[in-house]
Amino acid sequence: MFKKKNISLAVIRRLPRYLRYVEDLLNHDVLRISSSELSQRMGYTASQVRQDFNNFGGFGQQGYGYSTQVLYENLVKILGLDRNFKMVIVGVGNLGQALANYANFYKKGFRLIGLFDIDPQKVGKTIRDIKIEHIDKLKDFIKKNDVDIGVLCVPADVAQEVADIMVEGGIKGIWNFTAKEIEVKGDVVVENVHLIDSLMVLSYKLNEKLLEKERIK
């Protein structure tokens, strides 16, 4: 598959949305769609849609548009969803438990194979048939099972320490839900998720609407 180098993060962040939409089209037996139709429904320009896809080879045919099946298959490969990445969650509090029970991970091909915590009241219990192990076993578990992704749901003050254990075990990527910006060595990939940031963006949008109404009065 052709792929340009240095694809912008903005393009990459649009890919999951494309995938969700194309998946919905397939579920409704829509076999093809044009870039203009896709752009109108998603709120992008047709030019932007074409440019996004051209980063990876295009996928479309002039005069035909895009086969939704071909588009879906390519997006799955681009996003690596066909690799069935193995994951562990460290920190099985409210957020960790919610993530462990999130069925979409399995539907999208991610395999949750381990849960870890330090709380003796949680260790030994199971979620979705996965036994919660003590964090002391984390490094060896990652090595033995060649785990790809570590999901970090621990308190911020221990986030770096746990991330270091993951890296020592050979983790390839860390999905960080803590408030701590962790540092990693080597080629480990980190994706930080700050839930409060999204809420503050919503707050900004609501505030702008209220300010606009106040100006009109």
From Swiss-Prot:
Localization annotation: Cytoplasm
What residue ranges does this record give for the DNA-binding region?
17-56
Pfam families listed in its UniProt record: CoA_binding, Put_DNA-bind_N
Keywords in alphabetical order, please.
Answer: Cytoplasm, DNA-binding, NAD, Repressor, Transcription, Transcription regulation
Q: Does the keyword Disulfide bond apply?
A: no
User: Main localization of the protein?
Assistant: cytoplasm
UniProt record, GO biological process:
negative regulation of DNA-templated transcription; response to redox state
Provide the GO MF annotations for this entry.
DNA binding; DNA-binding transcription factor activity
Question: What GO cellular-component annotations does this UniProt entry give?
Answer: cytoplasm
Binding-site residues for NAD(+), renumbered to this chain: 91-96
Q: Which domain of life is it from?
A: Bacteria
The record's similarity note reads:
Belongs to the transcriptional regulatory Rex family.
What does this protein do, in the record's words? Modulates transcription in response to changes in cellular NADH/NAD(+) redox state.
- Subunit composition? Homodimer.
Protein name, as recorded: Redox-sensing transcriptional repressor Rex
Say which species the protein is native to.
Caldicellulosiruptor bescii (strain ATCC BAA-1888 / DSM 6725 / KCTC 15123 / Z-1320) (Anaerocellum thermophilum)
